[in-house]
Amino acid sequence: MSMTLVAEHYTKIIATKLLETLSSNVSRKGFVEGNPCFERVVQFIEENVKRSISLEQLAELALMSPRSLYTMFEKHTGTTPMNYIRNRKLECVRACLSNPTTNIRSITEVALDYGFLHLGRFAEKYRSTFGELPSDTLSLHKMKCIDSRESSLSSLF
């Protein structure tokens, strides 16, 4: 009977050591500034900001569990991975609407281009993030373009 207990004890020790060496646990070292995993995930988001990105894709890219990914994002950004992606998309939409060199046909087109399929929710999130509607941003952009054209024309005369 004591040999059975010893065998069980050693089996548990070996199993524990094997689990500690799995690649899924490697990424659990502390999340520090300049974390290459975090930087790789953020770079992927930036390069694919117009696409639909899943939590599972990001976790696989970071070589960690979705829960560990959440923890890493909370530490670095103060928000969840999906909120971070949505906020980056909103910032890109705002940049498009504010850019005087961008030829914008409609806000709907820009929103859809960045993956916002429900326009009501898009407008609500945009307003809660920036304090104005997308149409307000576009109107300000158009007014700035008109003002800059008028000032450049008046400088010619």
Curated annotation (Swiss-Prot):
Which Pfam family name is an example for this entry? HTH_18
Q: State the GO CC annotations.
A: cytoplasm
Which SUPFAM superfamilies does the UniProt record give?
Homeodomain-like
Q: Does the keyword RNA-binding apply?
A: no
Q: Which domain of life does this protein belong to?
A: Bacteria
Domain named HTH araC/xylS-type: residues: 39-140
Report keywords, A-Z. Answer: Activator, Aromatic hydrocarbons catabolism, Cytoplasm, DNA-binding, Plasmid, Transcription, Transcription regulation
What name does this protein carry?
XylDLEGF operon transcriptional activator 2
Species of provenance: Pseudomonas putida
